Amino acid sequence: MRRLLLAVCGLALVAGCGRVPLAPLAAGDFRLYEAASTSSSQLVAVINPHSQIAESRLPLGALSPDGAHLYTVSSNTLQDIDPHSGQVVRSLRLPGSFNLPPATLGGIPGGLSQNGEWLVLQTSGAQASSHMLLISTAQLKVTNAIDLDGTFVFDAIDNTGTRLYLIEYTNITQGYYRVRVYEVGAGQLGPYTVIDKGGNGTPEPMTGVRLSGVFSPDGQWLYSVYARQGSGAFVHALNLTMPFAFCLDLPNSGSPADGFHWSLALTADGKHLYAANGAMGSVTQIDNLDGYNPSIVRTKQVGVPGATANALVQNVEAKELGANGAVLSHDGATLVTTGTTGLIWIDTATLSARSSQLTKWTVWSLLASPDGSRVYALNDAGAIAELSMPDGRMGSTFNPAVGSPIGLLRVEAG
């Protein structure tokens, strides 16, 4: 009888609450790499979610895809730092003042190929001539010095180190540019302009500010999202084996600020790309099933559980969240993206919102753990939250107090 009463009481509790409350999420065994700035420097903090402190602080730089190298530039010297020990493994004296190109609008450094075998450094500022260095990371050696008349900035380097993609500004005042290919073996610019294969075949001036980008797993594509004043945002799908690209227009709300809130997430097989904008409540799916023709297959307004229309309006001061504003589960079934405030869990089968979390946070950056079990969110005050990828359960929240946040660079197994 006692067992029966306990069973009945248990059922009553479930019926009264609707479901059994989920257990709190235990801290995962991971290390976080956060880029931050202080009054005196920019840095990369290595953070332990268990102890909730920064175990080490390193100079701001570009992390290799495997997390084994941190490349930094200081005082005309390129350094290869072991992120785990903090020791300088190798260094290379540079022939002048060069910098790591930015990978995101928020200032996270880039310049690496998808496989991490090549690194490009460039001079800064709009000048009458442009200078870059192509470096083999295996040897930490300059293989090519590129000197060009005009204003060029780095866009991408392919995995073979033979094709350097550059943005050439044709009108600095208007912000017009075009994409060119520097043929490394020939030591010269190709005589062609990278064309929009989805257009009319005629090169046209491009405009826009690059927010962030993601490589395909095979290194054949670089997908970048750009915001344009008055024209909405677009995804620039750049083929890194041939001189062509696709420009895929994203929905335009008419608000210039909204265009700065697009983020990209790519499935593990590289076939499905999601462009998400929490400020607009919009998600666009781009498929590249054959590996040659990326195209928009659907766009949907995402209803956010418990949110009002006003909750989908962000201010332009938080535009840097475009660095890492969306992540996917390993199976591609769940998309987590930043909303106006907090995070939104989206079912990719229907592109409908399932739940939301951290509704009082302005999320600055977002990454997933390598095993796909955790989501780590960084807010504008530098606090970090750990959540479950499958169901959004909350884990710990803490502030490691490493400085003003720039973004999360990497999550790796502890």
Regions found by a protein language model. Name each.
Residues 14-16:
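C-terminal motif of bacterial Sec signal peptides marking the signal peptidase cleavage site
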Residues 48-51, 83-86, 136-140, 184-187, ...:
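Short loop/turn segments that connect beta-strands within beta-propeller blades
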Residues 48-59, 87-101, 141-147, 188-204, ...:
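A short beta-strand motif characteristic of beta-propeller blades
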Residues 38-41, 77-79, 124-129, 169-174, ...:
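Short glycine/acidic-enriched loop and turn motifs that connect beta-strands
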Residues 20-70:
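An edge-strand/N-cap motif at the start of beta-rich repeat modules
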Residues 28-30, 66-68, 115-117, 160-162, ...:
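Short coil/turn segments that connect the beta-strands within blades of beta-propeller domains
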Residues 378-414:
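Blade-level signature of beta-propeller repeat domains, shared across WD40, Kelch, NHL, RCC1
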Residues 20-24, 57-68, 73, 97-112, ...:
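Repeated scaffold domains used in trafficking and secretory/extracellular systems
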